[in-house]
């Protein structure tokens, strides 16, 4: 599994309202199995090429089999349009509400969309992805993706924070500082959705 996201160091506002003193990041992940490859989420407008360059360090982007859209907001999904153009055999994997969003935002043949629910799994060959419905965290189409063999959860925005720093892991940056940023993010974005959040945590 490889992080292929982007750190946006000089972004100073989120949604035109929320100050970003430490910038933000757009987290995308490449999961390479023995048989197939999945890209989990993509990046914000303006960063398509950086995403492609990072993917290319590991595989030919045209060989991607699945683009998993946990969330349809542009900072997660926008570059999916470009990936699907390059990886002509790839399919978009999302929830039923995500399919509705993709049909509005992407120029995509509906036959290329796989709708998943909590009974769905994708076998990549030694790497298995399963899905958790997490509606209203913080849009209605949100899902989490779980990589079973490595026990890694890709929780979309839910455990997020706005950080674009040199360190990659919380203990490198500082656990207390990381927790402070996560609390701020929860208060600013997720607090109105705390009940759906509790429901999602119970499923994990």
Feature map (PLM): residue ranges:
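Conserved beta-strand hairpin/beta-sheet module of binuclear metal-dependent hydrolase folds
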Residues: 1-57, 144-147, 151-155
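Active-site neighborhood of phospho(di)ester-bond hydrolases with catalytic His/Asp-centered motifs
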Residues: 40-42, 64-72, 92-95, 133-134, ...
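Metallo-beta-lactamase
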Residues: 37, 91-204
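Active-site metal-binding motif and surrounding structural segment of the metallo-beta-lactamase
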Residues: 46-93
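Active-site environment of divalent metal-dependent phosphoester hydrolases
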Residues: 11, 72-77, 99-101, 138-139, ...
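Short, structured coil segments at secondary-structure junctions
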Residues: 86-88, 108-109, 148
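Short, flexible loop segments at the rims of nucleotide/cofactor-binding pockets, characterized by
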Residues: 15-19, 43-45, 69-71, 129-135, ...
């Amino acid at each position: 599994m490889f992080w292929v996201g982007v750190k946006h160091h000089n972004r100073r506002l989120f949604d035109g309202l929320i100050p970003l003193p430490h910038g933000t990041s757009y987290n995308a992940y490449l999961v390479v199995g023995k048989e197939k490859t999945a890209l989990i989420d993509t990046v914000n407008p303006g960063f398509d090429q950086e995403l492609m360059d990072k993917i290319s360090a590991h595989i030919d982007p045209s060989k991607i089999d699945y683009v998993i859209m946990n969330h349809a907001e542009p900072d997660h999904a926008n570059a999916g349009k470009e990936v699907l153009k390059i990886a002509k055999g790839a399919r978009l994997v999302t929830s039923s509400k995500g399919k509705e969003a993709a049909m509005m935002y992407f120029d995509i043949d509906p036959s290329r969309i796989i709708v998943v629910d909590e009974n769905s799994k994708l076998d990549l060959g030694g790497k298995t992805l399963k899905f958790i419905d997490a509606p209203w965290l913080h849009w209605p189409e949100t899902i989490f993706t779980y990589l079973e063999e490595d026990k890694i959860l890709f929780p979309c925005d839910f455990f997020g924070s706005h950080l674009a720093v040199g360190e990659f892991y919380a203990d490198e940056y500082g656990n207390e500082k990381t927790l402070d940023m996560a609390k701020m993010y929860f208060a600013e974005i997720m607090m109105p959705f705390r009940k759906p959040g509790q429901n999602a945590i119970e499923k994990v």
